[in-house]
Every structure is written in structure tokens, then in C-alpha cells.
Amino acid sequence: MKLGAFYKGGDLVKPSGGKKGRVRKTKKKALGGGPPQIPKLGEEDIRYVERVRGGNHKVRLRQARYANVYIPKERRHVKAKILSIVSSPSNPDYARRNYIVKGAIIQTEVGKAVVTSRPGQDGVINAVLIE
């Protein structure tokens, strides 16, 4: 992905219309990470590893089909298939587009559950059963 399009530095044009010279070349840390890659509901789980600031690595989720659902009454976790996204409090449009984010309510094989992890950051979907 070309990150030059996401540079948010100062303009190189003065208010009078004259041109300013560059103070320094664009550094990688000033480019940002590009547009957010929000995980979607798909046919299988697809993950990728990305290098982030400080030389660390993050496992990001691109597509998801399964979630680790915690059942409070039974005090156990199950791997359940995600059937659909019911709603998303952060953005109503995310539910229509099948984006999975923290706080989203998903319909699974065992019932409705709330996503408690951050799939784009953690690379896994953890949820708690609500019905």
C-alpha cells in the first residue's frame, strides 16, 4: 500500500501563493498506517502479520468466520461459527457492511454475543454470550 497519499504534514505553499522549500524529507513515522483495515465476516479466518512502530509485530484479522464465545452460565468457552452481525454501536453502517469491531453484537451458533476483543489489533474475536 502506498502511504504517501496519507501524509498529513504542512503545505508547501505560502498564503501569498509562493512556494516553500521542504524542511526535511517525509519520515515513515509521519505517514501513519494508512486507512483502517477493519475485519469483515468471511468464509474463513484470514490473518496477516504487520510490522508496527518500535519494530514490534501485530497480528491483524482480515476476515473472520469463528469467534471464541464465553458462556457465563456454564463458565466455559466454545469456538462458534459467526452467522451474522446484528448491530454495531460504534457505527450503524458497520453492521450493514459486515465489519466486526469491539462492542458489535454478533449472531453465533450458540446465540447472540458481544465482541470484547479488538479484532483489527488482536487478530482474534473474543465474545461474551448475552442470550
Curated annotation (Swiss-Prot):
Signal peptide: none
Assembly and interaction partners: Part of the 30S ribosomal subunit.
Family classification: Belongs to the eukaryotic ribosomal protein eS8 family.
GO biological process: translation
GO cellular component terms listed in the entry, alphabetical order: ribonucleoprotein complex; ribosome
Keyword Metal-binding: no
Molecular function (Gene Ontology), one example: structural constituent of ribosome
Bias type Basic residues, positions: 17-30
Record's keyword annotation contains Transit peptide: no
Positions of region (Disordered): 15-36
Listed name of the protein: Small ribosomal subunit protein eS8
Keywords: Ribonucleoprotein, Ribosomal protein
Disulfide bonds: none
Matches recorded under NCBIfam families: eS8
Record-linked PANTHER family: 40S RIBOSOMAL PROTEIN S8
Source organism superkingdom: Archaea
Native source organism of the sequence: Pyrobaculum calidifontis (strain DSM 21063 / JCM 11548 / VA1)
Name of the gene encoding the protein in the UniProt record: rps8e
